[in-house]
A protein has these predicted regions:
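Non-heme di-metal
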Residues: 1-222
Length: 222
C-alpha cells in the first residue's frame, strides 16, 4: 500500500474539512468578531491546562509501559519533554485574562475535555502504535491552525501581548514539526486495508472530539 498517499488522502478528506468546521464554529467566529467573552477564553485556558497535565501523565505512563522497547521509550520521552512546559503556558494565558492560581487548582475537566484526555490515554495504554498517531496528526493540525487564529485575533481584538500568547506562538511552529513526524510514522506503518481503516477512524474521531471540546467550553463558560 502507498502509505504516503493514504496519509495525504486522510489530511485532504478528514483533517482539512475538520479544521474548516472548527474555524466556522461559533467559538472562533465570535473570536474573530471580538465578541467572544473573556469567560469563554478563560475556559479554554483552564481546560487546556488540565488536558496538558493529563497528556504529561499519559506520556509518563508510556515511558514506563514501553521501557523494554527502546524506540517507543525514546518516542514517549521525546513527547514528554516537548510537552512539559505547555500546562504552564496555558496557565500564563489564563492569568493574563484575569484568572488566579486557585482557579486552576480548583478546576475540573468538563465532559468534552475528559473525552479528549481519555482518548490520548487510551492510545498510550492500548498500544495503538504508529497507527494511533492519526489522532495526534489530526489534533496537532487543528491546534496549529487555531493557534494562528488565537494569535491574530487576541492581539487585534483583546490587546494581549507576546508573553500572554506564548502558548499559541509556540504551537504555530512546534505542531507543524509534530504533524510531519506523525505523517511519516503513519505512512511507514500502513500495510493492510485494516490499517488504513484504523487511521481514518482515528482521524475522524479526533475531529469529532475537537469540535465537541470547543462547543463544550462555549456552553460551560457562558
Amino acid at each position: 500500500m502507498d502509505g504516503k498517499a493514504i496519509v495525504q488522502s486522510v489530511i485532504k478528506e478528514i483533517v482539512q474539512p475538520g479544521i474548516h468546521r472548527l474555524m466556522e464554529s461559533r467559538y472562533f467566529s465570535e473570536l474573530r468578531e471580538g465578541k467572544l467573552s473573556t469567560r469563554r477564553l478563560q475556559g479554554w485556558a483552564i481546560q487546556h491546562y488540565l488536558h496538558n497535565k493529563a497528556i504529561l501523565k499519559s506520556f509518563a505512563l508510556g515511558m514506563v509501559k514501553n521501557a523494554h522497547d527502546q524506540e517507543l521509550f525514546n518516542y514517549y520521552t521525546y513527547q514528554f519533554n516537548e510537552e512539559q512546559t505547555h500546562p504552564d503556558l496555558a496557565k500564563k494565558f489564563g492569568l493574563a485574562l484575569g484568572l488566579k492560581e486557585e482557579d486552576f487548582a480548583d478546576a475540573t475537566q468538563i465532559f468534552e475535555c475528559q473525552i479528549h484526555s481519555a482518548r490520548t490515554i487510551y492510545n498510550t495504554l492500548t498500544g495503538g502504535g504508529p497507527l494511533s498517531r492519526a489522532s495526534a496528526l489530526t489534533s496537532e493540525s487543528m491546534v496549529c491552525r487555531y493557534s494562528e487564529e488565537f494569535n491574530t485575533y487576541l492581539r487585534k481584538n483583546y490587546g494581549l501581548n507576546d508573553d500572554a500568547l506564548t502558548f499559541f506562538t509556540v504551537h504555530m511552529v512546534a505542531d507543524k514539526e509534530h504533524t510531519a513526524q506523525s505523517a511519516e510514522r503513519i505512512a511507514l506503518a500502513v500495510k493492510t486495508p485494516r490499517d488504513e481503516r484504523v487511521v481514518r477512524e482515528n482521524a475522524q474521531y479526533m475531529v469529532r472530539i475537537k469540535l465537541g471540546k470547543f462547543e463544550g467550553i462555549y456552553q460551560a463558560y457562558a
